[in-house]
Design a protein with these regions (language model features):
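Amphipathic, hydrophobic secondary-structure cores in small proteins
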Residues: 53-55
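Catalytic core of pol beta-like nucleotidyltransferases
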Residues: 1-34, 43-50, 59-106
Length: 106
């Protein structure tokens, strides 16, 4: 049973672009102007069954942050972690820690 579960998790990681597209569809229902990037171990190809799919969400409207989180976590089966921020906060904070070549825009 554990092996099947582990394989399912690894398949989600391999399909991170498809998972990202699913997340983006949900996010766009809430904020049509949102930008989304996948980063982290799945982009580097160094993931395990314990990994998640890190998704950077850039929006001008942080008032919708919790609605976005609730909808994505409720509707997406894959293990994702949302990092929701503004363009300004991305430039001042996230860009210091996430190399540009490890950002995959969805």
């Amino acid at each position: 049973l554990w092996r099947r579960y582990e394989e399912k998790l690894l398949e989600h990681m391999r399909r991170f672009r498809e998972v990202g597209a699913e997340v983006k569809h949900i996010l766009r229902e809430i904020d049509p102007d949102v930008r989304e990037f996948v980063f982290g171990s799945v982009v580097r190809g160094r993931f395990t069954a314990a990994s998640d799919i890190d998704i950077l969400v850039v929006t001008d409207d942080l008032s919708k942050k919790y609605e976005m989180m609730v909808e994505v976590y409720r509707r997406v089966e894959a293990p994702v972690e949302l990092h929701i921020t503004t363009p300004e906060k991305y430039r001042s904070w996230y860009s210091r820690f996430i190399p540009v070549d490890e950002l995959v825009e969805i």
